[in-house]
Curated annotation (Swiss-Prot):
GO terms for molecular function: rRNA binding; structural constituent of ribosome. Part of the 30S ribosomal subunit. Residues 47-118 form the KH type-2 domain. This is Small ribosomal subunit protein uS3c. It comes from Ceratophyllum demersum. One of its GO terms (cellular component) is chloroplast. NCBIfam families: rpsC_bact. Its main location: plastid.
Length: 218
């Protein structure tokens, strides 16, 4: 069996950059890692709670964290920022204070910035959320995957691969189903490929969604 390496880690320094950027002593490294996880979880929970659409569609592409001695900078790359801060002038301040309460930042100041993603349907996390929402509504998995591929056409991507694993359609035996459109050169380091793994809980159990998007080639 072929062993699949994570496409993002495989391309670090070439076409991908780190999602968290900070330095720490070896003994404090695990604390910094847990702090990052708490920040990300807190933001996702807040967005889910405050999101105005019933499907719970967050639209977060990724969350970047940069730490200095006196500052923690959190950059939220979001596909549909209007859904989060529409009609709410203090949306970001409220989110900032909410995150600050969740973890002890000490003497460091927390700064939250929201950045809009130009082509939201070219982001694997947003597509995975869309598919998860469809599966929860008991839409056929093939229909959900094909619709997600149609949405990527708006983002001018060169290729996409979608994979769903688990008890699909409530079948007793778990299986893996996938679909590919265009080129997805996983072994080419200069090929910029975005990837995400997403877990969705359905009435039949947990399903895993994986998406690879071939954006461009350097």
């Amino acid at each position: 069996m072929g062993q699949k390496i994570n496409p993002l880690g495989f391309r670090l320094g070439a076409t991908q950059s780190h999602r968290s950027f900070w330095f720490a002593q070896p003994k404090n490294y695990s604390d910094g890692l847990q702090e990052d996880e708490k920040i990300r979880d807190c933001i996702k929970n807040y967005v889910q709670k405050e999101m105005r659409i019933s499907s719970g569609f967050e639209g977060i592409a990724r969350i970047g964290i940069q730490k200095r001695i006196d500052l923690i900078q959190v950059i939220i790359y979001i596909g549909f920022p209007n859904l989060l801060i529409e009609g709410r002038t203090r949306g970001i301040e409220e989110l900032q204070s909410n995150v600050q309460k969740e973890f002890n930042s000490g003497n460091r100041r927390l700064n939250v910035v929201i950045t809009r993603v130009a082509k939201p349907y070219g982001q694997p996390n947003i597509l995975a959320e869309y598919i998860a929402g469809q599966l929860k509504k008991r839409v056929s998995f093939r229909k959900a995957m094909k619709k997600a591929i149609e949405l990527t056409e708006q983002a001018d991507t060169k290729g996409i691969q979608v994979q769903i694993a688990g008890r699909i359609d409530g079948k007793e035996i778990a299986r893996v189903e996938w679909i590919r459109e265009g080129r997805v050169p996983l072994q080419t380091i200069r090929a910029k490929i975005d990837h995400c793994s997403y877990m969705v809980r359905t009435i039949y159990g947990v399903l895993g969604i994986k998406i690879w998007i071939f954006v461009d080639e350097d």
